[in-house]
Structure formats: C-alpha cells, structure tokens
Amino acid sequence: MTEQRPLTIALVAGETSGDILGAGLIRALKERVPNARFVGVAGPRMQAEGCEAWYEMEELAVMGIVEVLGRLRRLLHIRADLTKRFGELKPDIFVGIDAPDFNITLEGNLKKQGIKTIHYVSPSVWAWRQKRVFKIGRATDLVLAFLPFEKAFYDKYNVPCRFIGHTMADAMPLDPDKNAARDVLGIPHDAHCLALLPGSRGAEVEMLSADFLKTAQLLRQTYPDLEIVVPLVNAKRREQFERIKAEVAPDLSVHLLDGMGREAMVASDAALLASGTAALECMLAKCPMVVGYRMKPFTFWLAKRLVKTDYVSLPNLLAGRELVKELLQEECEPQKLAAALLPLLANGKTSHAMHDTFRELHQQIRCNADEQAAQAVLELAQ
C-alpha cells in the first residue's frame, strides 16, 4: 500500500444479493478505514455506500443460457476492460462477490498481475463440478465462505478459505416473534398455520404447485382450522400459482402474499418448500419444514450423477444428518408430503426438537459476517 493514496479496493458484484453483500462489506470497511476508495462493478446499494461504478451491476445480471449467449460479447468486453483498468489502477485488493462464472476468471487475470484477490461467497463446488476448486485455488488468495462445511471442503484441497458466518443469520433474530408475524398477516394466534413455498423460478412453481396444494387439501381434513399462507416472489409467479390453483384446488382458501416469505415462515407451524436458500431462511425462522422437489426426469438423472452430497437442503448439510425430511421426484407426492407434515403441525416433540436444533445451527453461523469479511480483506490487503 503506497503512502500517497488511500487504501484502494476493487469489487465486482453481479446481482442483487451480491450488491447487498458488497454494501455491508463497504460499510464495515469504512468504519475501519474511513478514507478507503472503492471502485468496480456495483449496484445501487454499493454505490450508495460510496463505491465508484465503472459499470452498472445490471450489465452482468443475466440469467439462463440463451440470455448469456446473447450478451456474451458484451460480457467478455467488460471482463477484458476490467482486467486492463484494474491492472493499471493496481488496487490493494480485488474482491469478486459471487458471480463465479464472471469473477473467477477475472480474479485469475488479476492475480497474474500481482493483485491480491478474494472470492466472496463460495460457489457450490462441494456439491457438483468439484474440479472447479483447482481453478478457484489458482485464481484467488482467499475464499470467504458462509458455511462451515464449505471451509472443510476447501481445507481438503489446501485452498485458503475463511468461514465468516452467514449474513442472513446475522439479520434474523435467534428467537423470532411468531405472534407478531401472525398479526402482520392477519392469522389468528391459536390457528394451525402452514406455509407453502413452491419456489421462485417459473419451472419450480409449475412442477410443484399442484402437489403442494393437494397436500394442503389433505391436511385440512385433519386440521379444519388450518390457515395456509403462500408467499410468491413477484406478480408473474402469483399469476402462475393462481392459474394452477384454479385448476387443482379452486375451493381451497389460502392467503396469497406478495413477497413476505420471511413473515410467512415465522408465522407458520410448518412449511412445505422447494429446496434452495428458502430452506436456510426457514431454518433461521425456526419453522419446522418438509422439502419437496421435483425436476424433469433427465435433469434428475443427471443431477444424481453430478451431485456429490447426501442431502439437497442446507439445514441437512449443516446438521450432517436428515434433520429435515426431503421428498424428491416420485417421493414428492401429496400423501407422502402430508404424512411428513402432520407431526410438525401437531407442534409436539418432533417440531420442538427440530426447533431446538435450528436454533443451535443458527448460532453456529451467526458470526457477524460483514465484520469478519472486512477483517479478512484488510488482513490480506495490508
């Protein structure tokens, strides 16, 4: 670090989740080094914290193979330009936030030029395409990992990795207020309540909604007072879910919510959800759950051969055992889903034990991630 200029940190975030992480990291760094300079690819939150944006984050936020191919020339141009400009700027450190397909190659380019690099948020190398770990090891000086089993994986391959905890675990209380959440959603305190979360992608909602609704119908037979809340991520998914409901369960009364997934989880006695980040959030909300997931047969066949983990849901990966019931493919059908949910709705020994384990796991990954990340960046930069 030269005397005549402030600590200079280059960052690239490629989507909203990365923008949130980047903003938290910049905030924590500014507390320690008030005159630090931040520059790179940033979204609105990072820019609000003072990051100078050479490119808008939206330029990188492309989903799906067709969209990526359509934008490939532009993406390659941006990466080449950043390699050149960061090479000239010689920042004290580069932090690639998630977006591994874009960032890991960029990190490798910069490391060759003598710039220290950090990759913030491990891709799921522990689950599939494990050989990527070697490329990550060559490209980065340090990986910042949200979860302890990720660090254990990198340690096995001698790739420097630091477990910093999960920002979502920092943001959510250890003991959520169920009744307050019910008041917000208009759910009586004494009713049984089930949350249905059929996924955030169109393909998931299409595959899972009908069986999730049929499961709720079966549970209503045992619990006639059952309140059913269905948070949907946007208007498109809501429209899709309403169409499926009109065909499958037109008479089933449910509360459709725009967003509010977290409130729905906190308010509910049990949740039925697709896998993914929602399962982690549900664990942190202390809501007992069943994971139901189905994909096209060929995709599942392929996934079974590629995925190297025993479980699909993060609570089970964290616990190292089947804490949460996972019903996949042909197992994901109404009778089996309802049978797995019944003991959770009874709010007895099963759900209490699950709740206690969720709380222990929450404490394990609640480490003040923004502060930990900032500390790691400064240690490497100086």
Swiss-Prot record:
CDD domains: Glycosyltransferase_GTB-type (cd01635)
Keywords: Glycosyltransferase, Lipid A biosynthesis, Lipid biosynthesis, Lipid metabolism, Transferase
Enzyme Commission number(s) of this protein: 2.4.1.182
Pfam family, one: LpxB
GO terms for cellular component: membrane
GO biological process terms held by the UniProt record: lipid A biosynthetic process
InterPro entries: Glyco_trans_19
Pathway: Glycolipid biosynthesis; lipid IV(A) biosynthesis; lipid IV(A) from (3R)-3-hydroxytetradecanoyl-[acyl-carrier-protein] and UDP-N-acetyl-alpha-D-glucosamine: step 5/6
Described purpose of this protein according to its UniProt entry: Condensation of UDP-2,3-diacylglucosamine and 2,3-diacylglucosamine-1-phosphate to form lipid A disaccharide, a precursor of lipid A, a phosphorylated glycolipid that anchors the lipopolysaccharide to the outer membrane of the cell.
PANTHER family, alphabetized: LIPID-A-DISACCHARIDE SYNTHASE (PTHR30372), LIPID-A-DISACCHARIDE SYNTHASE, MITOCHONDRIAL-RELATED (PTHR30372:SF4)
Official protein name in the record: Lipid-A-disaccharide synthase
Record lineage: Bacteria, Pseudomonadati, Pseudomonadota, Gammaproteobacteria, Enterobacterales
Gene that specifies this protein: lpxB
